[in-house]
Amino acid sequence: MIDRYKHQQLRIGSVSPQQISAWAKKILPNGEIVGEVTKPYTFHYKTNKPEKDGLFCERIFGPIKSGICACGNYRVIGDEKEDPKFCEQCGVEFVDSRIRRYQMGYIKLACPVTHVWYLKRLPSYIANILDKPLKELEGLVYCDFSFARPIAKKPTFLRLRGLFEYEIQSWKYSIPLFFTTQGFDTFRNREISTGAGAIREQLADLDLRIIIDYSLVEWKELGEERPTGNEWEDRKIGRRKDFLVRRMELAKHFLRTNIEPEWMVLCLLPVLPPELRPIIQIDGGKLMSSDINELYRRVIYRNNTLTDLLTTSRSTPGELVMCQEKLVQEAVDTLLDNGIRGQPMRDGHNKVYKSFSDVIEGKEGRFRETLLGKRVDYSGRSVIVVGPSLPLHRCGLPREIAIELFQTFVIRGLIRQHLASNIGVAKSKIREKEPIVWEILQEVMQGHPVLLNRAPTLHRLGIQAFQPILVEGRAICLHPLVRKGFNADFDGDQMAVHVPLSLEAQAEARLLMFSHMNLLSPAIGDPISVPTQDMLIGLYVLTSGNRRGICTNRYNPWNRRNYQNERTYDNNYKYRKKKEPFFCNSYDAIGAYRQKRINLDSPLWLRWRLDQRIIASREVPIEIHYESLGTYHEIYGHYLIVRSVKKEIICIYIRTTVGHISLFREIEEAIQGFCRACSFGT
């Protein structure tokens, strides 16, 4: 992401406990170090002030009101003459309250806790780097198993190696004796480890370079083996090779990013800034709190209980300590990702708690909703419908959307034309929808392009510029040929409208992003604006016409199909004007169609300009009709020629339909527009 500090990216990864401590700890001017959250409380029920060392402590996270401490004293922020910079009574610094949006705290865990993302998510990074089954590691983390091994290469008392289950018969009665024996803590810390601490010790002992070398050698050995013929064994070898590749890549990633594997086990738990997990007071004095606050409270309660048990470990049974460590691990798991281990935790109203993972992931998460796809001003959204009468570079904006997007421009136009004295009067005219408002809106829209975007924007054509026009209704009208570039369908898809404000954005929209300038695919160069199937069917219906021909007899196959119950006995068929009307131009023909005097496929005679191809044709006429004044008509299959007494051509009529005429006019207008554009460019 790009911000005011020119950061070009945001990377999420593991951090060291020292880094977490550096994020949260701060030294007050009196030398006191604060940052650790030790109490599970939020606000005092009587004073409504944050509890000291609690989840909303002002000493840790900063003052609620800028320059005002918890005691109510005020200091001017940034004034060097004001001294001291903090309240000596409550220890709150006199700083801006916005610090509560980024100042973090931390919880010092009484026992190590594995990060559930690295343990339970697939693939499990902890299981991959340790080369152990996930089920075995889960049993160790949640204290179902213990891990016995020499620590720091010292001599051992027990002849145990690896994992062992506490409930096996050989240790069922002997180990409890050690749990209550004086000095058991020293023995346990020396030879027996359980919980996330055992995982942390194993991760800390790893040599990543040796892992890469050994994995590569094993991968080569497996690659040299020939197929055994046993499908199960061959698949097993293939899976092992894939696992070794993933393990080497993970180890290389740790080396490349200077991340230690033991950082996947937490010793310090970061606490989010208070403004990111707020408590809001609603009507009636009731408080609404973020679910994360309740999950943090649960972690602090269980962690404090474990701390008390460890401080009195001489009188505390070891089983109770292990059980409490498991509860702390489960509380942290719920905070980070509720429900990842099965049944999610719910509140008193049977509502699932929203954990940290739920806050950041998904369509409504922090990244997609507020960082990647946050809503912006001068934008709208609506369903798209087809607008076949629109030019390729235009789109239809509903009046309701257009007046909101261009409201500031309309207000400026009303004030400039002295139709409104101030902004308030202009807004009242817009609310009343006076006719002058729509006139000014149309003037504004003529010189201002808009950007249409359909998510997901996977390539350059996912956002294009259009010249807007006002349309009725509440849907955005779009030319059907631009559908493919957006990968959209007219079956309920929605598109966003944006108004480019700066001159640079408007110039880019006009010169690079207009839809009629993006006719080719940027990936492969093929045409992107091609007729769809419904357009092809429409063109076929438009130009199919009546194919019976000028001659009608019982041997004509088209006549026999369409008129099976009719018989034509007039073999000497003659041309008759009443059946096929004459028109002097295409406008008259289309007008007759709109008046429903003829059909779309009805044959008609249209007067045509003199065509040398027709004049020079040697085709023999089918019939010749003579008029009383000496003129005569030479009738051919698809045209007729009217000649004078001196055999001079007076005019030519072609036999066509209204559908052919409409298509011809569209092609002619397109060619003329292209010629005008070329002449303008030269």
Curated annotation (Swiss-Prot):
Its cofactor is Mg(2+); Zn(2+). It is found in: Plastid, Chloroplast. Zn(2+) binds at C69, C71, C87, C90. Keywords: Chloroplast, DNA-directed RNA polymerase, Magnesium, Metal-binding, Nucleotidyltransferase, Plastid, Transcription, Transferase, Zinc. GO terms for biological process: DNA-templated transcription. Its main location: plastid. One of its GO terms (molecular function) is DNA-directed RNA polymerase activity. It catalyses: RNA(n) + a ribonucleoside 5'-triphosphate = RNA(n+1) + diphosphate. Mg(2+) binds at D489, D491, D493. Binds 1 Mg(2+) ion per subunit. It is an enzyme of class 2 (transferase). SUPFAM superfamilies: beta and beta-prime subunits of DNA dependent RNA-polymerase. Its EC number is 2.7.7.6. One of its GO terms (cellular component) is chloroplast. HAMAP family: RNApol_bact_RpoC1 (MF_01323). In plastids the minimal PEP RNA polymerase catalytic core is composed of four subunits: alpha, beta, beta', and beta''. When a (nuclear-encoded) sigma factor is associated with the core the holoenzyme is formed, which can initiate transcription. Belongs to the RNA polymerase beta' chain family. RpoC1 subfamily. DNA-dependent RNA polymerase catalyzes the transcription of DNA into RNA using the four ribonucleoside triphosphates as substrates. This is DNA-directed RNA polymerase subunit beta'.
